[in-house]
Amino acid sequence: RGFDAAVNEGIRESRTPYVFLLNNDTKVRPGCISAMEARMEREKELFSDSARMVDMRNPEIMDGAGDLYSALGWAYAIGKGKPAAYYGKPRKLFSACAGAAIYRKSALELTGDFDESHFAYLEDVDIGYRARILGFSNAYEPSAVVLHAGSATSGSCYNEFKVFYSARNNVYLIYKNMPPLQILLNAPLLLAGFAVKTLFFLKKGYGGTYVKGFCE
């Protein structure tokens, strides 16, 4: 049924003001959830708060400080592969990474569930996008530390499953959330972004998979 269906089922069963989502290839350091909950209590406009995800093999290296969405139509983890020391300050961001993030239950009732059409990948960017449209914001909390192995479920950094769904969901994300005028104005950059990604995955041996996902 996919990541989104499982997450939605858990959220519906929850009876707390906040819900904490966590990947199955992580370890949570002490104080993580309490730090995120305190931030949500202080800043009532927050839809979500993303943890400081660091590499499980080398915690001095970042795995991600939430998600950024660029004009090229690319969504990616902020700070991935960079020194964790550079990401010690709280900040606002485009969306939280659902691999380790806390969400406001009352706001989820307004945005709706995680979109199960995604199945996997970019569902966190999609729901963060929807929350921003409704006037909420998303944040990064550096004192909430989570160690992340990375791609433990899908098997590797790049594989057919991940490349296909990432490409498909990238197009769906734009179609679903961007107004037609914004799509028109951003079209040159979006097309350039897709062209660069196609070339990148051709070199990785997944060009056909990426194009298939893009056209799905």
Language-model segments: which ranges?
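Acidic metal-phosphate-binding loop of nucleotide-sugar-dependent transferases
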Residues: 1, 25-27, 118
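Active-site-adjacent helix/loop segment of glycosyltransferases
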Residues: 134-216
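Conserved donor sugar-nucleotide recognition element shared by glycan-biosynthetic enzymes
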Residues: 3, 7, 32, 99-100, ...
